[in-house]
Amino acid sequence: MSVGIVLAVLLGGRVERYLVVYEAGPTGFGLARYLIDAGIECAVAAPSKLQRPSGDRVKTDARDARHLARLLHLGEIVAVAIPTVEQEAARDMVRAREDCRGDLMTARHRVSKLLLRQGIVYYGGRAWTGKHELWLRTQRFDTPGLQQAYDAAFDALLTALDRRDRLDREIEALAANSIFTPVVRRLGCLRGVSTLTAFGLAAEIGDWTRLSGRSIGAYLGLVRTEYSSGSTRVQGGVTKTGNSHARRLLAEAAWHHRPRYRPGQDLRRRWDAASPAARARGQAANARLHARWVRFDARKKCPVVANAAIARELAGWCWSLAVLDE
């Protein structure tokens, strides 16, 4: 059934007020925005927060609709934030870039492993540099089938690389002139948070004011799991719930706080674009996060576990900068 038919049915009735709810999923938020613009209250329920009896294993559209209606009537629906068209478009661009990153990694593996099977190894320094690319272009094989396979793999690598660079340029242009620009500039005061990372966090989280410094870690799945009963308390690894894209960006940025704190040209350039208040807060965050890394290393803490803790605190600093009142 199309959205227009649904709207005609709702507006054609005699009920003064309608409440509409549906589960978040692959259908996106177009229906919710359409209904809200028409004056109909609509909520998009978070599937992970829907309460369902443990013995209820029959899942049909009719039963799901009744279950959602019952929870809506009781006020037990946990709604997700509905992004604007511009916010959703920015998020799609960020995720397209992430997909391209995965495609590029796959293409590089195919090229390197094809050469390795032939006993060809590059010893000229770091891989995937300009010098390495020139070396890859010189590889030739006597067997026609092998040469065609290598050419196809190398062409796929170049295509993925070109697509990634094109998306990087488009994201940087959008980050410099959009509704996300103020947040991107403030987040850029942190080590490891480049323009691409800052824009990705801004697009994925959207409205930072709905979170707090205490809740953003749980929202991104960076807090520990807990199994408690009475006086017994057992904690495990991080929950890894919530937005996996933003969590990956923070985890990668957290590693940058481990080396000695020496601001480089790129970081200083991002500082110059931000306000003095954001710069001061970013410098305080950088110093504290590096100090925590030093303590973790002194205790010989597992680096992966330590990085998760740094990412959790980094999320709090990002929230602090994003909601900073300048």
Predicted region positions:
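A detector of single, family-specific signature residues
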Residues: 1-326
